[in-house]
Design a protein with these regions (language model features):
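His/Asp/Glu-enriched short active-site or ligand-binding loop at hydrolase and phosphoryl-transfer sites
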Residues: 253-279, 331
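Structured C-terminal subdomain patch of bacterial secreted/periplasmic proteins
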Residues: 195-198, 291, 295-361
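Extracytoplasmic ligand-binding site segments that recognize negatively charged/polar headgroups
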Residues: 166-169, 185-198, 232-258, 304-307
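Bacterial Sec-exported substrate-binding components of ABC uptake systems
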Residues: 2-26, 31-104, 207-238, 357-361
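A short, structured surface patch at a secondary-structure boundary
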Residues: 64, 97-151, 157-162, 271
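Short helix-initiation/N-cap motifs at beta->coil->alpha
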Residues: 138-147, 186, 276-284
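Proline-aspartate-enriched helix->loop->beta-strand connector
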Residues: 146-163, 178, 284-298
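Short secondary-structure boundary segments
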Residues: 102, 162-163, 242, 299-303, ...
Length: 361
């Protein structure tokens, strides 16, 4: 948690429960209702959705459009004085040149939603927004911070968490005199509003963050309600696999990774949590046989890096699972799959389409 002292106090942390509301019986039109404007989704009627266990083949969730900002003329209330997650006291006086770095791309999506995309000067590979596409990548080997690349950009503010690192890199940036704020978001469906508001407070935009948080929660509630209408009464049994290449980076995502929230958010059963798997368990043949998922979710880059579906099926144990036998693999863009930011509702709805109504995806 962050203690923020400024003229405008830290935006109220709003703990909103995600609950299901009534959905239309015949068709669910998931328009942004003038609130976001960046996506419109239509799910078929429940009577038009077949048995998802009869669906075969790989399905891909496409890249999302950039988030619509709540303002195009943000005016941060600075300075902001805070104590970050590592216990350092930081004064944020300038948000004109921001680097926002995390494994999931959550921070750049949130800052874009707050109207600060023009202030972002670099990115990680997970920040895939079109508006940021021409910015330099300041990570190497996936998600290792390149300190030299960071300092060369002369940032006025670095926002980061320990989902990337190493910790020594963050220490070096701080030691170079760059105001550096280490965050500690929860990254769950229920914490979306809180996480947005905490970041908004850091950059001096608490009111804008509250608007973005409210909009995001409304979208999540609406979309989860719609998903409930088409999800089967007998839920699909699913795992989230994390893969990079054909070596040892091949894990079943478990407790604390966000996979449970994502899978349960679309009305499926997360087999990893059902079997009390820890943060990331090796996806060996024994573990896969024990879980025997009916569908597998992966990051798009993960499936590509392992050689596509052909390469994945060569992995010990995959072809023997129900998911492998039916090639029932769903991929989500790397920068969106576990971000749990302001595009969470869209992530859930697009994943639900891929699971239950691929013709609508």
């Amino acid at each position: 948690m962050y203690s923020v002292a400024q003229n405008h106090a830290l935006a109220r942390v709003m703990h909103r429960s995600i609950h299901a509301a009534a959905a239309a019986a015949l068709a669910v039109i998931l328009a942004a209702c003038g609130v976001q404007g960046s996506y419109t989704n239509t799910l078929p009627a429940a009577t038009e959705v077949g048995d998802p266990r009869s669906i075969q083949g790989v399905r891909h969730v496409g890249e999302f459009a950039d988030i619509e900002p709540v303002t195009t003329t943000p005016k941060p209330a600075l300075p902001v004085e805070l104590t970050d997650a590592d216990g350092y006291e930081v004064v944020v006086e300038d948000t004109s040149r921001i680097l926002a770095l995390d494994l999931y791309g959550t921070y750049t999506k949130t800052l874009t939603g707050l109207g600060l995309a023009p202030n972002i000067i670099g990115r990680t590979v997970s920040s895939t927004e079109t508006v940021l596409a021409d910015l330099p990548v300041v990570t190497q080997g996936g998600h290792n911070i390149n300190v030299e690349a960071v300092l060369d950009l002369r940032p006025s503010l670095v926002i980061v968490d320990h989902s990337i690192g190493p910790r020594e890199a963050i220490d070096q940036i701080r030691a170079a005199g760059v105001p550096t704020v280490v965050m500690q978001p929860e990254r769950t469906i229920a914490s979306v509003a809180q996480d947005i508001e905490q970041l908004g407070a850091v950059v001096g935009l608490p009111q804008e963050a509250e608007k973005l948080a409210q909009r995001s929660v409304e979208e999540i509630e609406r979309d989860m309600s719609a998903i409930k209408e088409i999800a089967p009464a007998d839920p699909l049994r699913v795992i989230f696999l994390y893969a990079r290449g054909n070596g040892g980076v091949f894990f079943i995502m478990g407790e604390g990774t966000g996979a449970k929230d994502l899978i349960e958010g679309v009305g499926a059963v997360d087999l990893a949590s059902e079997h009390n798997l820890s943060y990331a368990e090796p996806a060996n043949a024994e573990a896969l046989a024990k879980l025997n998922p009916e569908a597998i979710i992966m990051m798009s880059g993960g499936l590509e890096s392992t050689g596509g579906i052909e390469g994945l099926l060569q992995r010990p144990g995959i072809a023997q699972t129900i998911a492998g036998q039916n090639q029932r693999i769903i991929t989500i863009p790397d920068g969106q799959s576990l971000a749990f930011g302001p595009l969470t509702g869209q992530t859930l709805i697009e994943l639900a389409k891929a699971l239950y109504a691929p013709d609508q995806a």
